Amino acid sequence: MSKSGDNQPVDRYLRRQILGEGTYGVVYKATDTKTGKTVAVKKIRLGNQKEGVNFTALREIKLLKELNHPHIVELIDAFPHDGSLHLVFEYMQTDLEAVIRDRNIFLSPGDIKSYMLMTLKGLAYCHKKWVLHRDMKPNNLLIGENGLLKLADFGLARLFGSPNRRFTHQVFATWYRAPELLFGSRQYGAGVDVWAAGCIFAELLLRRPFLPGSTEIDQLGKIFQAFGTPVPSQWSDMIYLPDYMEFSYTPAPPLRTIFPMASDDALDLLAKMFIYDPRQRITIQQALDHRYFSSSPSPTEPGKLQIPASKGDALEPKASEQNQHGNSPAVLSPPGKMRRVMGPEGFT
């Protein structure tokens, strides 16, 4: 830290405009006066430790300092100032949610393949480093002017690997939460990120949220409606999970009826990402090796991908119209879009 009277780290960043606000702080666009580059500064209010903010922010800083990959957002700087913690990131122009919702953008099969390839490469690196992201969703996948997609928001990320380590199951936005989490599992691994990535894949294909449940019970119902109710022969351990409950049996419809325009290879990969038993679910590295990524068409080069002129343009209405999931209201972002912040007590 600089001595009193010297220039403070915050003076290096010239604030330009607010990009977003949440419960625990604000993100604003700024100019790094030292380099001339545009950056994004996340300003987090430092509440008391019972609120969990300090721990969450410090975990994010620690993990991001150890993660260095083309498809993971770069943490440039971090410093306390005036009762807040400032995290300085490379500036990214938009996110995948904005791309999916922008009806002025046509997503070709090659475009979808490119976005999934970049997403899985970033996740594969995390898992290689024994890091679970635990908050995968389209608006946490940021996109720069060069079309490169990068994983962001590691506030819920945790190290994994110990077979006896217990975590909270209250992670991920509900729409992207794996069934083992919805059944209350406290011991889980990389399969939870795989399931969420599958939901993102489906969302790219459909151009709308795939499983937009309103509650955890409704979320399970939507999953079972799409993939059939699991039976013990598919997932023997589910009946032992803390919050397991029995649902009436629903047979699985053919995936082709849900994704009529998807290729056979895309459907095969989706099916493997949505396997109920997390021990049998495809890994991220296996997904990257899947024939979907080597078959025609080739992934679009990132620099040729279309991105919105600015986030918020040409978006669909959020609530007034009906979506394609029966009579449910059209909602385009998960309830509680700001990430959940866990306190220091209990599971992590």
Curated annotation (Swiss-Prot):
Its main location: cytoplasm. InterPro entries: CDK, CDK7, Kinase-like_dom_sf, Prot_kinase_dom, Protein_kinase_ATP_BS, Ser/Thr_kinase_AS. It is found in: Cytoplasm; Nucleus. Disulfide bonds: none annotated. Interacts with CYCH1-1. Binding to CYCH1-1 activates CDK kinase. One of its GO terms (cellular component) is cytoplasm. The modification Phosphothreonine is found at T168. GO terms for biological process: cell division; positive regulation of long-day photoperiodism, flowering; regulation of cyclin-dependent protein serine/threonine kinase activity. Activated by phosphorylation by CDKF-1. Down-regulated by phosphorylation by WEE1. Expressed in suspension cell culture, but not in plant organs. Changing S162A: Reduces phosphorylation by CDKF-1 by 30%. Belongs to the protein kinase superfamily. CMGC Ser/Thr protein kinase family. CDC2/CDKX subfamily. This is Cyclin-dependent kinase D-2. PROSITE patterns: PROTEIN_KINASE_ATP, PROTEIN_KINASE_DOM, PROTEIN_KINASE_ST. Residues 293-348 are annotated as: Disordered. One of its GO terms (molecular function) is ATP binding. The modification Phosphotyrosine is found at Y24. Phosphorylated by CDKF-1 at Ser-162 and Thr-168. Phosphorylated by WEE1 at Tyr-24. Autophosphorylated. Keywords: ATP-binding, Cell cycle, Cell division, Cytoplasm, Kinase, Nucleotide-binding, Nucleus, Phosphoprotein, Serine/threonine-protein kinase, Transferase. SUPFAM superfamilies: Protein kinase-like (PK-like). The gene is CDKD-2. Residues 13-293 form the Protein kinase domain. Forms a stable complex with cyclin CYCH1-1 that phosphorylates human CDK2 and the C-terminal domain (CTD) of the large subunit of RNA polymerase II.
